[in-house]
Amino acid sequence: MQQAEQLRGQQRHADALAIYERVLRANPRDRGAYTMRAITLSDLGSAQLAAEAMWRHPDWFSQQERERIENDRVARMIGWASAEPIDAAHRYAETDQALVNVARIERESPPTLTWEATRLRVDSLVALNQRQRHRDVVANYQALKAEGIEVPAYVLPTVGDSLMGLRRPAEAEAVLRQALQHNPDDFNTQLLLGYALLEQERFDLAMPLFERLAATQAPWPRRNGASSGYENWDRFSADIALATARSAANHNRDADALLRERVAIGPDNAELQAALASIEFRRGHPSAALQRNAMALTLDPHQKQARSGVVEAQRDLDRLDLAAATFAPLRKEYPDDAGLQRLGASLERQRGWQVHLSHARGRSDNDTLTNSTSPLGNDFGSTLLEAESPLLGERWRVGLRARDDWADFQDTRVRYRSFWLGTHYRYDRLDVSAYGGRALDEFDRDGTAWALDAGWRFSDAWYGSLAWRTRDPDASLQARRFGITGDSIGAALRWTPNDESRWELQARQLRYSDGNRRDQLDLSGSQRLWASPHVLLDGLFAASAGRAKDDRAVNYFNPRRNSAVAAGVRIDQIGWRRYDYAFRQRLEVTVGPTYQSGFGSQWVPSAAYRHLWSLGDGSALSYGVSWSRPIYDGRREQQLGFDLDFRWGGTP
C-alpha cells in the first residue's frame, strides 16, 4: 500500500491501481485498498466505476471522499456530453442527466466542503453552456462573484462563450482576457477573444489576432522522433475564423479564396464545406450555397451550420415552405439556440405582412430664377404606400397600393392620385403580380389603370423581368396636365455576378394617348473599387438613350433624340453597427455629358447624401438629400430634393 501511494505521488495511477487490485484479490474487505482503488479510478477518468464502488460501501468513504467522487462523476458526464452523439435526438442526454444529478446532490446531500460545493456550481456552468442556457450561465457566474468566490480560470472561456451567445461581446472580452492572464497561450480562448473583438467592430485588434493564430499554427506539426506530422485541428479552426473575419471586414473575395484552397485539400470535411457555403451566401449566391450545404450534409447529416445555411438559402430563394420544413427539426433539436431563434423570427417576418412607405419632395429652378421649364415642375413630390398580406398557401399575397404624385407647373398643380388592389405570386424562380387601380384626381377621375409585372430568376447572377402599365404613374405629369395619359411596356435584365458588382439594362416604351411614342434604353452599374471594414468605395456608371416616334410638337418635354452618360463614385461609411442594428451614411457623386437634339451636349453634375438605418427587426429606414444641375431644352436648372424610404417585413 505504501508503494501504491508513492506511485500515486508520481502520477503513475495505473501502476498504483494494479497494486490495489492485487490487495483486494487477496482480501476483498480491505477498506483502505477499496477506497483508494475507487479514488484512483476517478483520477484515471473512470468516475462512474468509482461512484459505483462508493455506492456499494458508502460508509467506507469519508464525507470528503464521497463528495469528491460524486463531483468527479458529474464532471465526467459533462465532459462526455461534448462528444458528438450517435443519435441526434439524444444530443443533450448526458448534459441533462448531469444537471439532474447536480440538482439532486444540492437538494439531498449538499457538499459540506467549500471547494466541492464551489466545484459543483462551477461545473454546472459548463453543462448549462452546453445546453445553451446562456442566461443561467451568466447569472450563476455573477452569483459566484457576488459571494466573493474566485471562479477557476478553466471555466472562464465557457462564461465568455455564453456572454457571446447573449450578444454581450464587451463583457465577454473582459472575461476572456482574465482567462488569458492565467493561460496566455490557450488557443480556444484566443479564438473566442477574436470573435468578441470582431462583434464589437474592433477589426484593428481582431484581424491581427486571427492572422497570427493562423500563421503560428502549423498544419502538420511533428513531434520529436516522429516519422510524420499529425493533423492540427487548431490550424483548421484558425483558418475558418480568419475567413469569417475577412468576410465580416468586407473582403468576401479573400475569404472565398482561402476556403476554396482548403476545400481542395479536404473536400470531404463537412464543416469546411458549410463554412464555404456561408461565404457564397454572403457573396449573393444562394443557389450555390444551397448546393454546397447539401454536399456538407451528405458528409454529415447533422452538421448544424449546413442545416441552418439550407434554411437561409431556401428563404432567400423564396421557397419558404422548404425553409420551414428544414427548420422545424433543427429547432426541435436545438430549442435554446439563440441564433436559431433569430433565424425563425426572420422566417416569420418573411411570411408575414410586408409594408413599404416612401416619400420624395423636390424643387427645380433655372439659372435666371424665373419659372423653371423642368418637366418635373417647379415643385414636385410623390408618396407611395405598399402593403401586402401574410402568405396565403405559401405563395400568394393580397396587396394594396396608394400613390400620390404631384408637380407645380407655374401656377397649376397637376396630381395623379391613385389606389390599387391586386395579388402577388412569388415562389422559387417566378415572381408575378397583377394590380388594378383607379385614379382619384380631377385630371383623370375614375380612370382605370392596370399593372402587370413578371420576373424570372435564371441563376444567382441573372434575373429578368417584364412590366406592363396602363395610365402609368411614371408617365409625364406635364402631359397629364393636358389630359394626356401614358401606357408603358418594359423589360429589364440584371446581372449580379457577386457582392462587388451589379449591372442592369432596361428598355421601356411609353405610349401616350395623343399617339406619341417614346423609347428609352438605360444601362446602370456599380463595381467595387476598394473596401475596408467600415468603408466601401464603388465606381458608378450610367448611360441612357431616348427617342420620340416623330417630330410632332407636343405640350410636354419630348426631345426627338436624347442621351446621357455619367460616371462617379459611391462612398458607404458604416458609422455604427451592432449585430442587426446599423447606421450608414452614403455619398454619391457623378458627372457626365448629356445630349439633346437641337441643343447639343453639356456636362451635368449630381450629388446625393443619405443616411441608412437597419433597425434590427428586418426593417430599414433611409433618407437623404440630392442636388443636380440638369439641362432641358438648352436651359440649365438646379434641382434639390429630399426623399425618405421605410420598409418593414420585406419588400412587397
List the predicted regions and their residue ranges.
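N-terminal targeting signals for Sec/Tat export/insertion, comprising classic cleavable signal peptides
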Residues: 2-30
